UniProtKB/Swiss-Prot annotation:
Region: Disordered, residue numbers: 1-72, 87-106
A single GO molecular function term of this UniProt record: protein-membrane adaptor activity
Family, as annotated: Belongs to the GET2 family.
Protein name as annotated: Golgi to ER traffic protein 2
Residues in compartment: Lumenal: 170-196, 285
Organism: Saccharomyces cerevisiae (strain ATCC 204508 / S288c)
Gene expressing this chain: GET2
């Protein structure tokens, strides 16, 4: 019989020692070493207890709580779906209750145009807050007052001043004028002189346009509607452009001023055209 190697000897010794400990020898050996043979303390060796298999539950792959990042992405999508559903329900004629937290599309566009309000309640972009929509009946009434003012202005200027004055300078010796005593007075003589026509016509136009402008302001005050800000389509179109897109400061205000000057200038051009036509007719008739 061959001799055992050192490794085999150590293995057999370890197996015998393990078998001895498993039969209860570990506790008695521990008591001898520590001197607690007659002690009431628990001196049972852990080696004497049967080894219980410890099972650990597998770690869950996914956490029970939802991901915060995922919730932040889902919330706007849900709001957008609610808004689209509400708009679709309105388009098909069905009354769909809309969540109070869902923003209105028109209000969102309006807030983008005017800017978010600051602490003082004014828009951050420097634009005025959007006014309430004007009733169509009020617009019709304003147009009626404006057209009536223009009609009366043209009638008074043409019939009661321009037409008689043009007839006077083209026919100063007509048999119509001696019938009126005021035509023979000294202050009436400059009116009969054709060389004073340009100065007299310019003075009359300045006075008539000034009076018309004041009456126009009275119409706006009476109807509570501004003639250009609330009725002109070009001004409304420019007001939709956000501040800073076009490199012109106060573009809406400058456009309104330009349109006001054009309105007054168009009246002057109309009167000049009327004068030229009447002078041509009176000259060749």
């Amino acid at each position: 019989m061959s001799e055992l190697t050192e490794a085999e000897k150590r293995r057999l010794l370890r197996e015998r020692r393990q078998k001895k400990f498993s039969n209860g020898g570990a506790s008695s050996r521990l008591n001898k070493i520590t001197g607690q043979a007659s002690s009431h303390l628990n001196a049972e060796s852990p080696l004497d207890a049967p080894s219980a298999a410890k099972t650990t539950p597998p770690a869950s792959v996914h956490s029970a709580t939802p991901d915060i990042k995922e919730d932040s992405n889902v919330a706007p999508q849900l709001d957008l779906l609610k808004q689209l559903a509400a708009m679709q329900g309105q388009g098909t004629g069905k009354s769909t209750p809309q969540d109070s937290s869902t923003p209105d599309l028109l209000s969102l566009l309006s807030s983008m145009n005017t800017g978010m309000p600051s602490a003082e309640g004014t828009p951050s972009f420097g634009q005025a807050a959007p006014a309430a929509p004007i009733n169509q009946a009020a617009l019709d009434y304003h147009d009626y007052l404006l057209n009536r003012l223009k009609a009366w202005t043209i009638l008074v200027k043409w019939v009661f001043f321009l037409l008689p004055y043009l007839y006077l300078i083209t026919r100063p010796n007509s048999s119509v004028w001696p019938a009126y005593a005021f035509t023979q007075s000294a202050w009436f003589a400059p009116l009969r002189n054709p060389s004073n026509f340009t100065r007299i016509f310019a003075t009359f136009e300045f006075l008539s346009i000034s009076i018309y402008y004041q009456l126009l302001k009275n119409v706006e005050h009476k109807s509570k509607i501004k003639n250009l800000q609330d009725t002109n389509k070009l001004v409304k179109l420019v007001s939709l452009v956000p501040e800073g897109v076009i490199p012109v400061a106060n573009l809406k205000g400058k456009l309104i001023t330009l349109l006001q000057y054009w309105d007054l200038l168009s009246m002057l051009i109309t009167d000049i055209s009327f004068v030229l036509i009447v002078l041509g007719l009176l000259t060749y008739l």
